[in-house]
């Protein structure tokens, strides 16, 4: 029997979690679907764009991601302290980015005066929203529901897009976190969809490598949780993301080395003739 999410997610034990969502019947609803003879690769960009929006709204950082044709991997860091540090105005602004919200919140944002009863009601709502903005289930809900609506609208149909609940796995130490990130980043290679990390579309490793390639450019900021060797946060930044427990070069080398190991239970590996990424 599936366990309640509150029993699976305990940020006191660990703030890091591996989350997986699969399309219904594991159909290729984000790639080439052999049944319908249609290509839905463009939906991967939908998912990535939505993840970026959510990472700017929630107190949840993305450590790694891989968007595949029939499922999605995310390694997330839940920062409850950050959510508690937000002022009420910040919480309201963030929540109204996701939802239209009640009239009292919209009126407050517009600068209209509120009565004492309305102020009390809004204060209660703010604390509810604050908890949700640091909640893993609400993050995945805001991701999956939005993508399902867009896909159903495109297909002119109704019904489920994702299989039931998303799955989550607690990452209890640094070794588990880093190995899971590497596993997620190697998904296209292991599935035989890509030969190199640089060609692994819609993965965090490709994004980190692209960022590293333009490290001397002015436009080199990233929304991903930073590795320890990356540039420090700018003084203007109001929020400091926690740095992941591995250097940039060590992580690149780890993923590259792991991806070259041939596994009998996987279809793909990085070919031996491909030069190391470093």
Report each predicted region and the residues it spans:
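Short catalytic/metal-binding and nucleic-acid-binding patches
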Residues: 1-278
């Amino acid at each position: 029997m599936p366990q309640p999410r509150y029993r699976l997610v305990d940020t006191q034990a660990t703030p890091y979690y591996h989350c997986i969502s699969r399309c219904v019947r594991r159909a290729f609803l984000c790639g080439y679907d052999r049944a319908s003879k249609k290509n839905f690769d463009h939906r991967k960009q939908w998912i990535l764009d939505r993840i970026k929006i959510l990472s700017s709204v929630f107190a949840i950082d993305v450590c790694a991601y891989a968007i595949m044709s029939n499922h999605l991997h995310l390694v997330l860091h839940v920062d409850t302290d950050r959510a508690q540090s937000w002022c009420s105005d910040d919480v309201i602004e963030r929540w109204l980015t996701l939802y239209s919200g009640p009239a009292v919140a919209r009126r407050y944002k517009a600068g209209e005066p509120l009565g004492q009863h309305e102020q009390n009601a809004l204060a209660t709502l703010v604390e509810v929203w604050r908890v949700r903005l640091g909640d893993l289930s609400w993050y995945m809900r805001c991701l999956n529901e939005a993508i399902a609506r867009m896909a159903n609208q495109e297909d002119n149909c109704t019904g489920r897009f994702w299989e039931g609940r998303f799955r989550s796995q607690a990452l209890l130490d640094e070794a588990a976190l880093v190995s899971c990130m590497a596993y997620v980043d190697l998904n296209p290679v292991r599935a035989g969809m890509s030969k190199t990390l640089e060609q692994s579309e819609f993965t965090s490793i490709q994004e980190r490598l692209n960022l590293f390639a333009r490290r001397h450019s002015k436009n080199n900021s990233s929304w991903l949780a930073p590795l320890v060797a990356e540039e420090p946060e700018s003084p203007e930044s109001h929020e400091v993301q926690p740095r992941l427990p591995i250097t940039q070069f060590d992580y690149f080398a780890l993923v590259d080395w792991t991806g070259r190991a041939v596994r009998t239970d996987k279809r793909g590996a990085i070919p031996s003739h491909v030069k190391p990424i470093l």
